[in-house]
């Protein structure tokens, strides 16, 4: 509760809604979407969920900058998240968290390189997948055929540079 979060890639506002529930009543989600039709649909979904009091919908491209400052977190679900890393660093408060979802490993590599270049620390990437199990006494195992899509979540924290007195 009370956190200030920027999300880029509002989509249908499913993740926006989850974040809003977590940070309310005193927090704020600023969610950016470049596609106007997605933003209209997201607004309807947020109205139905009763969450517009803690969500600010913004039509804009975060690769051009993030207006908000002193943020607790920046969450990216977009095609070119590495282009947002310098803006996220400026927008986050010290020790703020960045999370990026990428469907391809090539995107992950670009994100991690940008994070390291801009001074983020504690950079970790995990793969997300669903694997169904065949459960039977004495012979439980993963299903033989797995149809699904994997994705990758990359986490990082903004480091604060502290100058030591000499």
Segment roles from a protein language model:
Residues 12-25, 89-90:
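Conserved SAM-binding loop of SAM-dependent methyltransferases across substrates and taxa
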Residues 26-30, 98:
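Short beta-strand element of Class I
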Residues 32-81:
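S-adenosyl-L-methionine
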Residues 6, 75, 99:
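N-terminal Rossmann-like NAD(P) cofactor-binding module of classical short-chain dehydrogenase/reductase
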Residues 82-152:
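C-terminal substrate-binding/active-site "lid" region of AdoMet-derived donor-dependent transferases
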Residues 156-166:
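C-terminal lobe and adjacent flexible extensions of AdoMet/dcAdoMet transferase-like proteins
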Residues 2-11:
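Conserved class I S-adenosyl-L-methionine
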Residues 23-24, 51, 92-96:
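Helix-to-beta-strand junctions that scaffold the AdoMet/dcAdoMet cofactor pocket
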